[in-house]
Amino acid sequence: MKHETIVLADGFRVGVSTVGTGAPLVFLHGLSVSAKAYEEMLTRLAEHGFRVIALDAANHGRSGSLPTGHTVEDMTRVTLKTLDELDIHRAIFAGHSMGGGMVVEIAARHPHRVAAAVLLDAAAGQEHHDNIKVGHYATLAFRAAKKLGEAVTDIVGDGYEAMHLRDTGEKLSFLGMLRDSVSGLRFVRAAFALMKADTTPLLHAMYRHGVPTAVLHGLHDQIVPYEAGLSTAKITNASFYGVDGFHSWMLADPELAADLIALALLDLFPRRYITGAG
C-alpha cells in the first residue's frame, strides 16, 4: 500500500493511501484513527479488483486541521478537493462511523460523484443523533461517562475478536498498525462536528437522488445503535447486512469486511456497471 501526503491548491495537506487497480473505491475512516488502521481490509478489497483510495480526514492522521467550529460538510469539501486533485470525479464511496457520515453528506449533496455508497456502522440515522445530541449541559458529564463506558465495551469486544483471529506475528502487526493510526487529540473538533450534524434530511436526499446504497452494521454496536443502521437502510432503501460484531468489527475481521463490501456491491448492480465508476 502506498502512503503519501498531497498539498491542495489552498495549502491544505491530506494523507492519501492507495492500493490496487480497477474501479475506484474511496474509503473514509472512523473518528480518532486514520486510514492506516484499515490497511488489512483495504488490501483485501484491492484483491477483489478495486482501486482503493483511502483519505485521512481533516484533523486526523497526516492531514491538516480545520478551525474549531467546522462542520462535517467542511470536512467533505476537503475530501472532494482531494479527489479532484487525484482526477477522481466519480467513485464508489465506503465509510466507517464518522467516515460513513461523511459519505452520506457527499452522496446527498453531490450524488453525481457517487456510483454507490457503502455505510459501515455509519454515524447516521435519527437514533444515532438522539444518542449523542448536543445540549443539556447539566447532564453532559453523565452522558460522556455513559458513552465512554459503551465505547470501552465496544472496543474490548472487537479487540478481543481481532486478537483471537490472528497469530502472534499478526497480533504484533495489528497492534502496531492501530498505534500508528491514532490521531492525537485533534479529532475532538471532528467529534463536535458530528454531534452537531443531522443526517436524516441527507438520507432522504440520497433516496430522492437514487444513490445505490448498502448498509452494514454490527449487531452489538455500542457507539452507533443497531437501530440507527436499520433506519438508515429504511430511509435510503438500502440493502442491509447485520454483522455479528461491535462498532469496529471490520478491524477485528478485515477479510470478512472486504468480502461483505464486495458482495454488497455485486448485489446492488452488475460488475460491468461498477467498473464504469471514475
Swiss-Prot record:
Residue ranges constituting the AB hydrolase-1 domain according to the UniProt record: 24-240
Signal sequence range: none
UniProt keywords, alphabetically: Oxidoreductase, Peroxidase
Class in the EC hierarchy, top level: oxidoreductase
InterPro entries assigned to the protein according to its UniProt record, in alphabetical order: AB_hydrolase, AB_hydrolase_1, AB_hydrolase_fold
Superkingdom of this protein's organism: Viruses
Residue intervals passing through the bilayer: none
Pfam families named among the record's database cross-references: Abhydrolase_1 (PF00561)
PANTHER family: BLL5160 PROTEIN, HYDROLASE, ALPHA/BETA FOLD FAMILY PROTEIN
Active-site residue list: S97, D221
Molecular function, one GO term: peroxidase activity
Gene3D superfamilies found in the cross-reference section: alpha/beta hydrolase
Family designation: Belongs to the AB hydrolase superfamily.
Enzyme Commission number(s): 1.11.1.-
Protein name according to UniProt: Putative non-heme haloperoxidase
